[in-house]
Amino acid sequence: MKKKILVFLLVLVMAASMFAGCGASESSSNELTLWMAPMASSDAAVTDEEFWTEVANAFGAANDCTVKVEIIPWDSYEEKYLTGVTSSDGPDIGWLYMEMFYDYIEMGALADLDAYFSDEEKAGYLYYDLGNIQGGQYALPFVVGNPRVMLANMDILAQAGVDAVPTTWDELTAACDAVLANCPGVTALVQDWGNPHYGSLNEIYWPYFWSAGGEIVDDEGSLTINSPEGLEATQFLYDMAQKGYLGTNATACDDVKVPFTNGEAAFAFMASGNALQVEGINWEYVTALQGPQDAETFVAADSLVMFESCENKELAAKLIKHMTSTETMTKYHQTITDQPPITVDEAYTGSEKFAALFTDDADMLRSLPVFKGASSLYDALYKSIQSMMLGELTPEEVLSKTTDYYNSNLK
């Protein structure tokens, strides 16, 4: 029902825009509204708002325009976009992650960017082609990175008699057994099943799912999580919880970085950018664990988009180019978030500890697919696995009930 309401509202706003003009920007063709995601750490010297306001003010001064910046909190991110777009009070330029694209493209809410970039400009972006989604250049990849990796507290492993970071599922379970046997009070593997947002699946579910050989959808866009491979991954997580590897209450944690940084856990999957904020712990990492079929993990592929309601698309495209210039991106990656370059001219300035992620281990990195009802499907799956962790569902029920829900309500 939620999905049907979303589609209906988007239809209404697209129809209304034919008569009402350009929504949030209609007051002036020299005004742009920019919505960005929060990426700076909570204790950062420069906030996201401060950074992008400075960029926007410089652009405005050079182009005789005004750019209004708003940072959208993650906990209300999708709702904010939905409300803004359907009420003609959304941005001219926004930041979408893959789960959000299908419906906005399907209903004509996003502008095709291709005509605003010359061939020379396109060649300056490392991942320009990844922005071609559902037959149009609706995105300009902006954050292609932040892989989810497994961190290991090497001092805890030494106490447990484990001399190397596990690289396979079997090695992980053996190491967890050793931690439980030799390190009282330590959680072997901390997972944030208490986090309210399904984005945690990127760290604590999809790496196992893909490494078991699972596929979220097939080439026709049909949901395929209820497969032998999907069950093997879900059963593996369930078994780890049952063995006590995840602590006494797997749904109590909502941020794995806290217990890991406090030395309370031997292992934790987290974004590479968050890992660099872990101080005071002797940690090493593995990019992905070898499962029954493969070794794969999640990598972000978030993008900048221009909304069709924007009145001055030429100006908006110019702002996007300014935001993604080598100069701006270098400063952004050094000041706000440690990510790999998105342009050919930007040098990698991130931690050498993770330099191999995008070279030697690049074939292990995988993004989420774009398909109908993705966000709602992920939310339903996440809640089902939370119920499994509470003993309310079996692994088989998680996959079957989620698939039935998707096919009945979202497909």
What are these regions (language model features)?
Residues 111-125, 129, 188-199, 212-232, ...:
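Short, solvent-exposed loop/beta-turn-alpha elements that line the ligand-binding surface or hinge
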Residues 136-142, 148, 171-222, 265:
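Extracytoplasmic/periplasmic solute-binding protein
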Residues 61-125, 132, 155-167, 257-259, ...:
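Extracytoplasmic "Venus flytrap"/periplasmic binding protein-like
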Residues 98-148, 173, 183, 201, ...:
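Hinge/lid segment of periplasmic solute-binding proteins
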